[in-house]
Amino acid sequence: MSTIEQALNQTNGAGKVRRDIVRFGDGENDYFTAAGTDEDFAALTEILAKVAESPEQLKKMRDMPMSERPGLVISKGERSSYGYCAKTVLSISKITGTGYKAAAVFAHEFQHQCQYVYGNAQRFAHAFSLKESILEERIGEAAAETAAYQYLYDVKDNNPQAQTAYKAALEKRGMRAYALARRKGESEPDCVLAGMQGYADNLRLA
């Protein structure tokens, strides 16, 4: 059974499941494969439309080779997680809805896909000590969360709903650190580093 089939088996949703594509732009290759019900496809389409409002996220999706893009699903059985990425499948939990919060979750999980595809650490994970493995995992999580910060900052002025999602995220230390660096006009790598450090400063998370 494929990973995406396993994910679908965990969705616990009613309705006929189909496989198709979900578009995020007008380009020939601006799409992901997906599986789910008509309701799931409608949700994924709405989420990706919001993700694509960020030029950085749009570029990131377009730059990902077609062969490396994960299949998308909406998970209905999760209560303790907003989503996950497992290389061949990226799942967004139904509990996140279809608004900018859900789009930020996608940005987070898609950053994990970028880590799988482009990250050198994955190639040498077998040689890591336990301490190194834990550190690598937490750095990866900090980078993924900062991708969500970057997304929310990019779209915050688009409409009131985006502004609300951004303001809610400011409760997070990492979001505040990233936003402050952006307002200061720092380079994007420095903004990302600030966001990651802000995330790591929260001892409950890192």
Task: Give, region by region, the residue ranges found by the protein language model.
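Short pre-active-site segment immediately N-terminal to the catalytic Zn-binding motif
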Residues: 90-106
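Active-site recognition of the HExxH zinc-binding catalytic motif
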Residues: 104-117
